[in-house]
Amino acid sequence: MLQGHERSITQIKYNREGDLLFSSSKDQKPNVWYSLNGERLGTYDGHQGAVWCLDVDWESRKLITGAGDMTTKIWDVEYGTVIASIPTKSSVRTSNFSFSGNQAAYSTDKAMGQNCELFIIDVRNADSSLSEQEPTLRIPMVESKITSMLWGPLDETIITGHDNGNIAIWDIRKGQKVVDSGTDHTAGINDMQLSKDGTMFVTASRDTTAKLFDSESLMCLKTYKTERPVNSAAISPILDHVVLGGGQDAMEVTTTSTKAGKFDSRFFHLIYEEEFARLKGHFGPINSLAFHPDGKSYASGGEDGFVRVQSFDSTYFENIFE
């Protein structure tokens, strides 16, 4: 149980090795934790608004965050200093490094008379001059705003999930849409996470389902159904398991008892689409989930402001579907 945020968690992410866990929340200060024992290693001070998203690069050298203060910041992971701060015209909803770490992408909200836009920047020699540089690509989103985003294979494409449930793939060399999922989801996409090999990804949607998609064709492969909005979903790196977390929207939560089971982490079998376990813990909706890269534990961040890291016992690995 990691206590260090004063307000609800917005996103959590492990680095590639899994020794560090990064968390962002609405209290303006992203944190980094040592995932093995839950020790807080430091905070990244500098944002003036709720931090909506974060991502750490492949080498755990740089951290990118996007916030409601209309900036994207790139940080030095080890020293906690700001390498670059990029101003935007509305709050930043998603931000991700590419696999190579040479580029980063971020998207802004449709607000204050501004359209939602997707930006791609070159971060190879990131320094304070990045705020004056033009992005290498900007794509205006005409229809619905972006609510989650992933880099496709080989840094050639970007997969975007939208507020209307649509998913699209963009070719960043041409700057145009190449694949559109249509209406597999009927409500907004809250989260998307890739499988370990990058061939598929899982979506979490307000329409109470999570779905598994092929990451090149956007073909819907599997559907995991629940009774309430899904805020986050993650794929196990070692087993055919998916974990879903959610609950009602923060606005609709009353003081229900946790026994109602609305705020559990729910485990589904990736292929059979059957739920086989639930884990309690949070006193409110789960906003973000992440599997440890070794697949032996997972972390969840909730509306209650806590991050919980849970290790699996041996019975979890003796697969019940064999």
Curated annotation (Swiss-Prot):
GO cellular component annotations, sorted alphabetically?
A: eukaryotic 43S preinitiation complex; eukaryotic 48S preinitiation complex; eukaryotic translation initiation factor 3 complex, eIF3m
Looking up Pfam families in the UniProt record yields: EIF3I (PF24805)
Q: Which domain of life is it from?
A: Eukaryota
Disulfide bridge map: none
Repeat region (WD), residues: 4-43, 46-85, 141-180, 184-223, 281-322
Q: Molecular function (GO) terms listed?
A: RNA binding; translation initiation factor activity
- Signal peptide positions are none
Q: Main site of residence?
A: cytoplasm
Q: Which UniProt keywords apply?
A: Cytoplasm, Initiation factor, Protein biosynthesis, Repeat, WD repeat
Can you say where in the cell this protein is located?
Cytoplasm
Coiled-coil stretches noted in the UniProt entry, renumbered to this chain: none
Q: Which GO terms describe its biological process?
A: formation of cytoplasmic translation initiation complex
In terms of InterPro entries, this protein maps to: eIF3i, WD40/YVTN_repeat-like_dom_sf, WD40_repeat_CS, WD40_repeat_dom_sf, WD40_rpt
Oligomeric state and interaction partners are given as: Component of the eukaryotic translation initiation factor 3 (eIF-3) complex. The eIF-3 complex interacts with pix.
Family assignment? Belongs to the eIF-3 subunit I family.
Purpose of the protein: Component of the eukaryotic translation initiation factor 3 (eIF-3) complex, which is involved in protein synthesis of a specialized repertoire of mRNAs and, together with other initiation factors, stimulates binding of mRNA and methionyl-tRNAi to the 40S ribosome. The eIF-3 complex specifically targets and initiates translation of a subset of mRNAs involved in cell proliferation.
PANTHER family attached here? EUKARYOTIC TRANSLATION INITIATION FACTOR 3 SUBUNIT I
Question: What is this protein called in UniProt?
Answer: Eukaryotic translation initiation factor 3 subunit I
Please name the source species. Drosophila virilis (Fruit fly)
